[in-house]
A protein has these predicted regions:
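Helix-loop-helix hairpins and the membrane-proximal interhelical loops
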Residues: 2-7, 20, 31-92, 103-118
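Alpha-helical transmembrane segments of multipass membrane proteins
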Residues: 72-73, 100, 200, 204
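Perimembrane loop-to-helix junctions flanking transmembrane segments
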Residues: 93-99
Length: 207
């Protein structure tokens, strides 16, 4: 029986090695393509949720915009400029405490009194945040994103986000998908920007 020559064995090994390398490269290429497809799908879903959240605020705007305008005009009557009103509303996104702060502004209390009164009124956000936190943890929302979500959270943002959580639960979604950070931010950013902008307009008109 004729034994294979050393050259034939070497060629055979080389062919096998090339085939294995080609298969590995093909598998890597398929994995990369699949990863890109999943990433693109997640990106599209995030934007879809964001715009869904923004659209859900439209009925609420009927009540929020007039209140923001009234707050701005009251601020102007108490000596706040449009820029000052916008800054206050942007950094303290809570209508009740802002009306209280504007009312206290003219009575010339100390700055500490205004801060304490605002903080006490905003304490309800601690309860709202505590109710939302378990769903955010299940969705594995990072700490920076959680802080951002809490910053733009007001009563209406919380209510719409919880409504979305319950809707997804009824639809049979898993616990990790009940809270949508994108939906929450769509609601929060829309309400936040609308609020401080219309308050600034009210201050400019009423000044």
């Amino acid at each position: 029986m004729t034994k294979p020559t050393e050259g034939a064995l070497s060629a055979k090994d080389g062919t096998s090695s090339e085939r294995v390398q080609t298969d590995a490269e093909s598998a890597d290429s398929e994995a990369l393509s699949s990863s890109k497809a999943v990433s693109q799908s997640d990106h599209e879903d995030a934007w879809s949720d964001f715009w869904a959240g923004a659209r859900s605020t439209l009925p609420i705007m009927i009540g929020i915009l007039p209140l923001g305008f009234i707050l701005g005009t009251q601020g102007a009557q108490h000596g706040l400029s449009a820029i000052g009103m916008a800054i206050m509303c942007a950094f303290n996104f809570a209508g009740g405490s802002e009306f209280a702060a504007v009312a206290l502004w003219s009575s010339a209390p100390s700055f500490i009194v205004i801060v304490c009164a605002t903080w006490l009124i905003n304490c309800r956000h601690i309860v709202l945040g505590a109710a939302l936190t378990p769903f955010m943890q299940s969705a594995k929302v990072s700490t920076p994103r959680s802080l951002l979500a809490f910053f733009v959270m007001c009563d209406e943002t919380w209510a719409l986000s919880m409504q979305e959580v319950h809707r997804r639960r009824k639809a049979g979604r898993p616990a990790a998908e009940l809270f949508s950070f994108s939906y929450h931010m769509g609601v929060g950013i829309t309400l936040w920007t609308s609020w401080f902008m219309v308050a600034a307009i009210g201050a400019a008109v009423g000044g």
